[in-house]
Regions:
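Gly/Ser-rich, low-complexity
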Residues: 1-73, 89-98, 107-179, 218, ...
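Hydrophobic alpha-helical transmembrane segments
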Residues: 68-80, 198
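Membrane-embedded alpha-helices of multi-pass transport/permease systems
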Residues: 76, 121-124, 128, 186-189, ...
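Core alpha-helical transmembrane segments of integral membrane proteins
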Residues: 76-86, 109
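Membrane-water interface regions at transmembrane-helix termini and the short interhelical loops
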Residues: 82-95, 184-188, 216-217
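Alpha-helical transmembrane segments of helical membrane proteins, especially in multi-pass transport
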Residues: 176, 180-212, 226-247
Length: 290
């Protein structure tokens, strides 16, 4: 009689703990799938598409505050170039009309660049978005984790476990699940931080663009332009990080060792956070921005 009671209690506890573990793991891997898709959706957006109200505010600030400063810089640069051009020609003794034509062309280019700063900057991010969208079809198709297959592996592995091991496993899944939620917040901060950096970077765009037509100061604008491309293509590097992360998660085999699978998932997520943080410096290094 007591054997039947104890067997029934053990069966009930086993079903309870197995259900808890399976639920935690399914929730965890579902969150991994959602996380990878959310990162792909975030990095694939342009500044105006991510938040149009913030973009409009930054553009208005740039047009009303920064462009007048850029206009002053252009004026100083053009005056300096005109004086240098005239003095280089033996104090106006060797003046020809061609050099004035080149000067006016350079002046027109400088004014055009400043007046179309945001159009040029957004064109750069459109290029980055096009690259991300072209790769997202391939990457997203390989990042989805098959939860049903994992569920079958979990059930087979837990069938041979004792009650004590199931209790330990349930606690481990709970801890790892909470850690993944914290890491998910960190990843969200990284995503939002990149977009805020883009808005701050583009808000001062007219000033470096104003220097691009000058030989001595042109490196300021050139370096800024490289920085724009670095920020735009950082999204592609983030997509590659997500693809690598999903491939690592997909290689985990729950049936062999659930404990290792749990902490392996957490370790891979920490690596993802670190990799996403490194994409900014790596992209700047690739494009030669500093």
């Amino acid at each position: 009689m007591f054997d039947n009671i104890f067997a029934a209690i053990e069966k009930w506890m086993r079903e309870l703990l197995s259900g808890m573990v399976e639920s935690n793991l399914s929730t965890m891997f579902t969150a991994v799938n959602q996380q990878t898709s959310e990162i792909a959706a975030q990095v694939g957006q342009t500044p105006q598409g991510w938040n149009s109200s913030i973009f409009s505010m930054i553009r208005n600030i740039s047009d009303s505050v920064v462009i007048p400063i850029a206009g002053i810089i252009i004026t100083l640069i053009l005056c300096y170039e005109l004086i240098s051009m005239l003095t280089e020609r033996n104090n106006l003794h060797n003046v020809d009309t061609w050099m004035f034509f080149k000067y006016f062309v350079k002046m027109w280019i400088a004014v055009y660049l400043v007046s179309h700063t945001f159009d040029i900057a957004i064109a750069v991010f459109d290029i980055g978005q096009s690259v991300v969208n072209s790769s997202s079809g391939i990457i997203r198709g390989n990042t989805a984790i098959d939860i049903s297959s994992l569920s079958m592996q979990m059930q087979a592995a837990m069938a041979t476990m004792a009650i004590g091991e199931l209790v330990t496993l349930a606690l481990e899944t709970l801890v790892v699940s909470w850690c993944l939620k914290i890491l998910s917040v960190v990843i969200t901060v990284i995503m939002y931080g990149r977009m805020i950096e883009i808005y701050l970077y583009t808000s001062l765009a007219p000033i470096p663009f104003a220097t691009m037509s000058n030989r001595e100061w042109g490196h300021v604008g050139t370096n800024y332009f490289r920085g724009l491309f670095a920020l735009a293509f950082q999204a592609f590097l983030m997509m590659v990080c997500v693809a690598i992360y999903a491939a690592l998660i997909g290689s985990i085999r729950v049936s062999s060792d659930i404990h290792s699978a749990l902490f392996g998932t957490m370790a891979y997520t920490v690596i993802l956070c670190f990799s996403l943080l490194k994409t900014g410096s790596l992209s700047k290094q690739i494009f030669g921005s500093h």
